[in-house]
């Protein structure tokens, strides 16, 4: 008698080309896989973690007692004679990371402390600098002396400008030389006035007080010269 069927044959394991068959097979096999894993945990008191990605990219997981607990145990708490080196390597790496974090934080703290001390010192110097006017020049420190010199220079500049302004108001043709580096003297109203000195330098005014200009006008007395 001839057999009507081909009998039991071994199915070739290849990827399915038909999309609908692939999705149906995945759903059935996934459920069967998780069921077998659950039975294995019950029979052998084993701890299992499974993560499955579907063809569409969805994630499915199974774990006993919990997937997260088992993953943490695998990453950081590996024990056993065969995994001693792995555990030591992980511990060393963890210590190195902690040391690096500690060094960075310590550097930031030291930097902030230095900035704080610098700001406090500047505030103290500013407070002391404001008291220079009530002390003798011999009693001033560096910061107070610097403040005094700066204020006096500003005051001298204001006085010079005010004096020149008043002179120009009384005699528009009068010119006072500046402390510029110009080599040639300025010619004003027929006379030469040196520009190598400031208006209030130690040598006094930039021209002889009794000098009579060509136009016969006495500078100091503002009267016609002899």
Swiss-Prot record:
Residue stretches of biased makeup (Basic and acidic residues): 108-127
Subcellular location: Nucleus
Main localisation: nucleus
Phenotype upon loss of function: Embryonic lethality when homozygous.
GO aspect biological process, one term: embryo sac development
Cellular component GO terms, alphabetical: nucleus
Keyword Coiled coil appears in the UniProt entry: yes
Annotated Gene3D superfamilies: Transcription factor, MADS-box
Cross-referenced SMART domains: MADS
InterPro entries, per database record: TF_MADSbox (IPR002100), TF_MADSbox_sf (IPR036879)
Superkingdom: Eukaryota
Segments of this protein annotated with the region Disordered: 108-131
Pfam families from the UniProt entry: SRF-TF
Coiled-coil positions: 95-132
GO terms of molecular function: DNA binding; DNA-binding transcription factor activity; protein dimerization activity
UniProt entry keywords in alphabetical sequence: Coiled coil, DNA-binding, Nucleus, Transcription, Transcription regulation
Domain MADS-box: 6-66
UniProt xrefs under PROSITE patterns: MADS_BOX_2
Function: Probable transcription factor that controls female gametophyte (megagametogenesis) development and chloroplast biogenesis during embryo development.
Name this protein carries in UniProt: Agamous-like MADS-box protein AGL23
UniProt source species: Arabidopsis thaliana
Lineage of origin: Eukaryota, Viridiplantae, Streptophyta, Embryophyta, Tracheophyta
Gene label: AGL23
């Amino acid at each position: 008698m001839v057999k009507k069927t081909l009998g039991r044959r071994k199915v070739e394991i290849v990827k399915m080309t038909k999309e609908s068959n692939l999705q149906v097979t995945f759903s059935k096999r996934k459920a069967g896989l998780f069921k077998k894993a659950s039975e294995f945990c019950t029979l052998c008191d084993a701890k299992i973690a499974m993560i499955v990605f579907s063809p569409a990219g969805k994630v499915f997981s199974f774990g006993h007692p919990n997937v997260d607990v088992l993953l943490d145990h695998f990453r950081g708490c590996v024990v056993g004679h065969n995994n001693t080196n792995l555990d030591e390597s992980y511990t060393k790496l963890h210590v190195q990371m902690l040391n690096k974090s500690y060094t960075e934080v310590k550097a930031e703290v030291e930097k902030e402390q230095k900035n704080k001390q610098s700001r406090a010192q500047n505030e103290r110097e500013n407070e002391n600098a404001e008291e220079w006017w009530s002390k003798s020049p011999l009693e001033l420190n560096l910061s107070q002396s610097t403040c005094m010199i700066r204020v006096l220079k500003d005051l001298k500049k204001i006085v010079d400008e005010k004096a020149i302004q008043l002179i120009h108001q009384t005699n528009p043709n009068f010119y006072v030389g500046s402390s510029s580096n110009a080599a040639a003297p300025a010619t004003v109203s027929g006379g030469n006035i040196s520009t190598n000195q400031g208006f209030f330098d130690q040598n006094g005014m930039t021209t002889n007080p009794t000098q009579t200009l060509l136009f016969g006008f006495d500078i100091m007395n503002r009267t016609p010269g002899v």
